[in-house]
Amino acid sequence: MNNTTLDYYNHNAERFTSGTLDVQFTAVQDRFLGYLAPGARILDYGCGSGRDSRYFLSKGYQVEACDGSEEMVKIATKTAGIAVKQMLFEELDETARYDGIFACASILHVPSKALPDIFRRLKRAVKKDGIVYVSFKYGTFEGERNGRYFTDLTEEGLQKILTAADPAHPFVVVDQWISGDARPGRADEKWLNAILQ
């Protein structure tokens, strides 16, 4: 994630939280949890406000959470009630630790040329047969928009990046869907959602 994007979240943490914390997101959260055993270990990767971590904890899952923004980490720690780690995406360095990784509207801030490395890190961090949920704004735009860097993806764009990350054994897309934005007044904005294994 570039410094401009981190600065955006550090300076707008409260405003961002007020616009996302109470968004009804259980359809996506439960779809992800449907692939996991009860009590599984989850990493909320780029956790933002901590909304999803709080939900997963309430359902009895073991949750670790991280975010690159110092201010978002403070908010997420309060929201989720756990110690949230301040960490950049490229600092993930775990091996077979998690049953599931939830990267909701987070790694879309990574430039496309750096995404293969991020997916390699995600693949290494999940256990054998573990799953990873990712979401990206739907499309082909890449660059700065409203003070943040975005990489928008289509199904084809995601598959190219997954193949580039590991040509011999890429993540398999086990579930994929297009959704509208869950925030009020933004239903016309489309999102690519995928569950990888």
Where are these regions (language model features)?
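Class I (Rossmann-like) S-adenosyl-L-methionine-dependent methyltransferase catalytic domain
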Residues: 1-96, 110-117, 121, 131-197
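Hydrophobic adenine-recognition pocket in adenosine-nucleotide-binding enzymes
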Residues: 106
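Short, conserved loop/helix-junction motifs that constitute active-site signature segments
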Residues: 124
